[in-house]
């Protein structure tokens, strides 16, 4: 618990620093961009499902998740129009938990807030890029016949690869793959009895439009 608080505080500080850097004026000429993205979230089953609270020590089978639409946006900067940049990436998806035998499915939504370092090839028309960094994942579990509504915030990581194609000097189309890994901790999923922890991993495919200035 202490380690989790420490990591969360460090990550929050890093995200805040990223936002402040993105929003502060810089004496160095930089290339800024904003982007909108739309795609699909292909989540692996929730694995390593373990009880928490009074249910600690109990294991459960994997929870299969549905494929869902995903959407979001980006705000980023390449200082000095160089190879390296940073970006704030926010995306949202709804990988609901599928039916568990005779138990109905459970609504699940996930908001991914990532602070990424990006390395690109700064071509005039084509710009392939890779990146990654820490993320905060805000997941909300819906109320069902077996669960209570619960929200958790966990630390995770994103890795991404994509390619951008400029259709004008300032407007580009892009496609991107992003992989996310985290551990969800729904401590109140079963009310006062306890909850569960599980490993969350997802693959996302996006297409988007970015404006550079």
Q: What are the residue ranges of the model-derived segments?
A:
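Predominantly the C-terminal beta-signal and adjacent terminal strand-loop region
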Residues: 47, 59-61, 168-213
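Cleavable N-terminal export/targeting peptides
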Residues: 1-31
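Residue-level preference for beta-strand/loop junctions
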Residues: 30, 67, 109-111, 153-155, ...
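Outer-membrane beta-barrel proteins
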Residues: 59-63, 103-105, 120, 145-151, ...
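Short glycine/proline- and aromatic-enriched beta-strand/turn motifs that initiate or cap beta-hairpins
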Residues: 26-82, 204-213
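Gram-negative (and chloroplast) outer-membrane scaffold detector with strong preference
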Residues: 42, 71-146, 181, 200-213
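Outer-membrane beta-barrel translocator domains and adjoining extracellular loop/strand segments
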Residues: 46-55, 97-104, 140-148, 185-193
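Repeated loop/turn-to-beta-strand initiation elements of outer-membrane beta-barrel proteins
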Residues: 32, 82-86, 125-126, 165-173
